[in-house]
Amino acid sequence: MALRPGAGASGAAGAGTGPGGAGSFMFPVAGGMRPPQGLIPMQQQGFPMVSVMQPNMQGMMGMNYSSQMSQGPIAMQAGIPMGPMPAAGVPFLGQPPFLGMRPAAPQYTPDMQKQFAEEQQKRFEQQQKLLEEERKRRQFEEQKQKLRLLSSVKPKTGEKNRDDALEAIKGNLDGFSRDAKMHPTPASHPKKPDCPTSSHSTKTVSPSSAFLGEDEFSGFMQGPVELPTCGPSSTAQPFQSFLPSTPLGQLHTQKAGAQPLPPGQAPVSFAVHGVHGQIPCLSAASASHSMQKAGPSLEEKLLVSCDISASGQEHIKLSSPEAGHRAVVPGSSKNSPGLMAHNGGAVDGCVSGPTTAVAEKTSDQNLSKEESGVGVFPSQDPVQPRMPPWIYNESLVPDAYKKILETTMTPTGIDTAKLYPILMSSGLPRETLGQIWALANRTTPGKLTKEELYTVLAMVAVTQRGVPAMSPDTLNQFPAAPIPTLSGFPMTLPTPVSQPTAMTSGPAGSIPLSLGQPIMGINLVGPVGGAAAPTSSGFMPAYPSNQVGKTEEDDFQDFQDASKSGSIDDSFTDFQEVPASSKTSNSQHGNSAPSLLIPLPGTKASTDKYAVFKGISAEKPSENPASFGESGDKYSAFRELEPTADSKPLGESFAEFRSTGTDDGFTDFKTADSVSPLEPPTKDSFPSAFASGAAQQTQTQVKTPLNLADLDMFSSVDCSGEKPVPFSAAFSTSKSVSSRPQPAGSAAAPASLASTKASSLADDFGEFNLFGEYSNPASVGEQDDFADFMAFGNSSIPSEPKADDKYEALREEGSPGALSTSTVEGAHNPPVSSSKYDVFKQLSLEGAGLAIEEFKENTPSTKSDGDFADFHSSKFSSTSSDKSLGEKAVAFRHAKEDSASVKSLDLPSIGGSSVGKEDSEDALSVQFDMKLADVGGDLKHVMSDSSLDLPTVSGQHPPAAGSALASEDALPETPFPAFASFKDMMPQTTEQKEYESGDFQDFTRQDMPMVDRSQENTCPSPASSVASHETPKEGADDFGEFQSEKPKISKFDFLVANSQSKMKSSEEMIKSELATFDLSVQGSHKRSLSLGDKEISRSSPSPALEQPFRDRSNTLSERAALPVIRDKYKDLTGEVEENERYAYEWQRCLGSALDVIKKANDTLNGISSSAVCTEVIQSAQGMEYLLGVVEVYRVTKRVELGIKATAVCSEKLQQLLKDIDKVWNNLIGFMSLTTLTPDENSLDFSSCMLRPGIKNAQELACGVCLLNVDSRSRKEETPAEEQPKKAFNSETDSFKLAYGGHQYHASCANFWINCVEPKPPGLLLPDLL
């Protein structure tokens, strides 16, 4: 601490001291003291970490300690990847040379370099995709975040800040955006407090993550990112902490106060130093978070690390992750106490250092809070010292810069209004520009000084070359000012494009390194990374994450060293190293990170996500040293998970994996998917995963805008599955992680999982927050459902389940209970409850798996498929079941194992309820999932929009699957809120859950309080919950309807049992409807809507109609139409129901038509004066009105034919038809005054009747009248007859709409929607026809 020479230094010093307490002689230099060299300062920040851990320090110092870096694998890997994270960007690989100042390059073995380079390249490509995808996702995420904000205020706060501070950066930090989504994590945080220890660690991390998300703005804002570590605990506080006003210590203190630190955490805070005592809180909180959130916390921590990146945050993150993470991995799921203990140990050693770092960092960050991060901030604060000569040396400033300066200079300074169009002409996304601005604008907010302008232009130029400008320090890499390409200023040509681009590949990391400063900052200067590049932060964090992931390997070595030393200080140093390492990793992951970094806008989320993941990895390692048991456990969990399972490869794999996976948690977890590095390149390779994911995601996103948002976080990460992917990402992440290191990696997998989840939760968290909020361990607000679910499922870990625990609960459940599928089934909680929860969890896990599976199914990555498939089937289960990931995957897997297939995942959610069915469901699931994934994956998701839709999909599923689903349904309904997203995200899981959700809604909600919690719909009563879930009646009904259809086989029974089964006939009707709907509607909108709808549904369960309606907006007709019927006849079973349904629907239709016609008749009859009446009727409005009435009558005529065709007998229907004819005949008298009287032929639709032999009759049948949508009355009437009656011309008559798998006559659908109910009935043509 003594070394805190300055704010920047203090951050470094804090970090330095944090690790060793006194031993950390981190030079404040790191704080950004280092003047010009962003990297170096970062490194220095990292350096402090390095000091403690020289090997890592070298990495941190990267440049300074190239020797250290080369110290060994650690030095090599950790050094740059881990330690030099700051420089890591540079050391990325061989890229350290990019920085040139770093001899870190040697750190990586040629293979590593090669891998990194390749992965970097892939990442870069994927990131490019991600950027676009994430831009879209950002929009979605922003919307979702808004929803989320509604659901979770805290996240909202963070989001607001983030939005305000870095709306642009938001795009950049899409991952962060997701993190913001993850911000719900903050929402979760509140829950986390429930489980102070686990909760806490998770919370901190979560906040970190959230903050990371917010870090978009927060990181960029300042060290807040760091604060987020503690702050996230309380979103408000984090933001406060973000604010310089809130001293880090204070923030930490607040955090500590806000989220009681677990025993371990408390010690940590003390361990951290008095000053850091507060910080320790943060640290502790962080650690706690780490523990609690395990994966997410780690991820978030990583994110936090990235975010905070400042030594403090990084340290904290590291410490927390170290303590928390490690604890999390080993005990996160297993035992909060253990975690706590571990956390305590780790935290004590680690946190203390990190805390200090955080405190210092915080101060630093507070100082430079405006700036990216403390580290970055310091780097950035001393912008000029760090600025290359061509920025402050007038003689070296390019003419292009001067020209722009002259153009924008006014007497009052540089006119931002004039500069704006110039910057916009660079073609960079607003988020990227916002990020750059945030990084450069340090003097007067909103106004740039000359040097800042030059910095902005240079960073724009660098970014245009594909090298993310993590911080102004990056510019030090350029001997001459890079000239941006501005359409307005042709003179600016990016000459060095190729070089930077090259850098991007290799130097990408290095540039990030420069940026890397932030990256370094990420370590110590995490804030630099996080803050400096809050925009970058997301990026950077991701970067650090990446590196951290890599770091894991390196870190592991480092940690091992640290572990060997066994000194907590050392550990912390190690941990610090990890941050440094993280930076290094970042560097290392430069490959991944650079790519990540490069797609600053979109990458951020991924990056962040990954960052979190990485961070987790790194953290974990750091924790390793911190607590031997924990350390070993944690890191080993991680390490095991990664290095162990993927042990060796993981180092590389992790590096490359992370590197590759760095892009997003998903990649990460995808990587997990592709355990082998080979896979990582393909799948792991973000490019593949992300490419596919991105592409798929893009498709998905295209398909499913929501997906974009949800997936954005998740999707981008999970790219593979559209909706499912998001969840997959989060869950898959877990899963994949476990998958990746299945054997040993299991534990790590959970960490990874958690981490990924965190990261997913960060990224996915955003998504997860979107849906992850729901499904993800209750990522945050919505996460309540999940949290509840989690808590619910994790009765044992009820408190934790909330937010962190959600994951953790999930995790814990996975760990202890999840280890055995039983957990999922009921090991943890009450059979129903736990089963449910577990099921839910498993569903969630499975969902992840499913998502993953679906994801793999949907994902281009076959690897993922294979891996996950295995993982899904049983390999994952068996392998992962041991580890934390196992915990998660275990539940996941167990469910899977139970089911033996992806479906099994869902099946487990049924608890043991449909174990028998599970097997069949298994195959069916997988088959169906695959089928759906391929064909209806989207559909499934679409369906998943409403549980009813899912059931539909499942309806398509083989009945066996359906039945399994049925039981599962009960559970899923509850999870539906959580799983609504989940469902959305994972087609299979989703679909199963979805319909299961419906059932489960009923079942579960009735079953458990969890339902209430789960009831995102907020319907407390089971019935309500069911209804609320989808919409009370529609939702439940929809669900039921679909469910009944889906559980055609056993599920039907189950459904019936759940009183959700409609009628078999109905089921079949719906099923057939679904068949068309599934593919037609579900595929595109539903999936897109899926997340949104789900969110909506969950968010607004009360408006039953509205929700279904919303869903309906996507899968309106199917869901609405079928659900309505089902709704009504939900309790009915048998053939009668079908007929009754027709009678019921037509009765409503004719009743409404009678009202319309009668009103018209009464209105006209009410006009005493025939002259006035004639005038009214002949007026434009009168004619239009009567034309509408005529159309309504024509609908009744069509329905009448449908009634006759289906032989539906009902006195009420007959009476209604008679009444309508009476009123109509009366009304014709008035119409005779105009030319409106319809020709008899226009009312004769007998030619539209569908005969039994007609092919595709089901597709041609109108969902309202069951008549052929392609036939028109004009066939009966001659064209001549038609001509005078414009209302019935062939054009109008032929209008038909497709919705929910059904086609409708435009007039039928419009009448139904406007006069009967908002969702079309989706009646199926009876087979009897």
UniProtKB/Swiss-Prot annotation:
In-chain residues carrying the UniProt-annotated modification Phosphothreonine: 1115
Biological process according to GO: endocytosis; protein transport
Domain EH: 393-504
Motif (DFXDF motif 1): 555-559
Keywords: Acetylation, Coiled coil, Cytoplasm, Cytoplasmic vesicle, Endocytosis, Golgi apparatus, Membrane, Phosphoprotein, Protein transport, Repeat, Transport
Residue ranges of coiled coil: 112-152
Listed PROSITE patterns: EH
Alphabetical list of InterPro entries matching this protein: EF-hand-dom_pair, EH_dom, SYNRG
Subunit structure and binding partners: Self-associates. Interacts with GGA1 (via GAE domain). Interacts with GGA2 and GGA3. Interacts with AP1G1 (via GAE domain), a subunit of adapter protein complex AP-1. Interacts with AP1G2 (via GAE domain) a subunit of adapter protein complex AP-1. Component of the aftiphilin/p200/gamma-synergin complex, at least composed of AFTPH/aftiphilin, HEATR5B/p200a and SYNRG/gamma-synergin, which plays a role in the AP1G1/AP-1-mediated trafficking of transferrin from early to recycling endosomes. Within the complex interacts with AFTPH/aftiphilin and HEATR5B/p200a; the interactions are direct.
PANTHER family (UniProt xref): AP1 GAMMA SUBUNIT BINDING PROTEIN 1, SYNERGIN GAMMA
Protein name (Swiss-Prot/TrEMBL): Synergin gamma
Originating organism: Rattus norvegicus (Rat)
Highest classification ranks of the organism: Eukaryota, Metazoa, Chordata, Craniata, Vertebrata
Gene: Synrg
